Amino acid sequence: NYFFRLSKYQERIEKLIETDELRVVPQTRKNEVLSFIRSGLEDFSVSRSRERAKNWGIPVPGDNSQIIYTWYDGLNIYQTGVGFGYDDKLWQKWWPADVHVIGKGIIRFHAVYWIGMLLSAGLPLPKSIFVHGYISSGGQKMSKSLGNVIDPFEVIKKYGSEALRYYLLREIPAHGDGDFTYGRFEQLYNADLANGLGNLVARVAKLCDTSRLEFENEKLNLGEGVKKSLEEFRFDSGLAEI
C-alpha cells in the first residue's frame, strides 16, 4: 500500500485548530479533534489492493495493482466541484470554503486528514468546520428494520421545503443530536408558521388592500443575541430569539 505522511503535519494542524485559524465548531468537537491529534498522528494508507477493493475504484497512477482509498480521492470533490484543475477562475471564486458542514461521524477525515492533504499540496484551507450531530426518529436511531426512517422528500411533498428547513433549524440542537417526530413537526408548523407568521402576513396583506402603507427602507436590527447565535452556528437559539 501507499501511505500519506500525516505525521509530518501534526504540529501545524494542531496549531491551526488550537488558535482558531481553522475554526472547528462546536467547542466539544474542537476538543475531540485536538485530543486525537495530541495522541499522535500516524501516517495513513491511501491505497488498497485491487483484490481488497474488489476491483472497484480509481487505479493508482503507475501501479495498476492498487486502488486509491475512497476517502483520499473523495475529499477533493470540495475543490473539483468548483473548478479545481479545469476552471481556475471558478475555483478562485469559491475556494477556500468559508465553512464545511459535516456530521460528527466523519470529523477526523475533514479536520485532520483533509487538512494535512491540503497543507501537503500547498493549497488554501477551509476557514471553518461546523460539525452537527445525528437526528433520531421518535427517540430511536433510524433503521429500515424498525421502519422509522423519515423520508425528507415525503415531508417536503406534503408541507414544503421551507417548513422542513424551519423545523431542522428551530428544533434540532445545532451543537448536538436532535429528534424528529411528525407530532412535534406539525405542532411547530401550525403554531409558528401557519398561526404565527401566516396570520401576520394575512393581516398585513389585508391592510395593504384597504390602506396606502409606506415602509421605511431600513435594515432590521435583530439584536446582538441573534448575531452571536448565527456566528456560533446556533441556529436554534437564533430562531428562538427572533
Q: What are these model-derived regions, one by one?
A:
Residues R212-S229:
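Acidic, turn-prone loop/beta-hairpin segments
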Residues N1-E216, A240-I242:
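Structured secondary-structure scaffolds
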Residues E224-D236, A240:
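Long, non-coiled-coil amphipathic alpha-helical linker/lever segments
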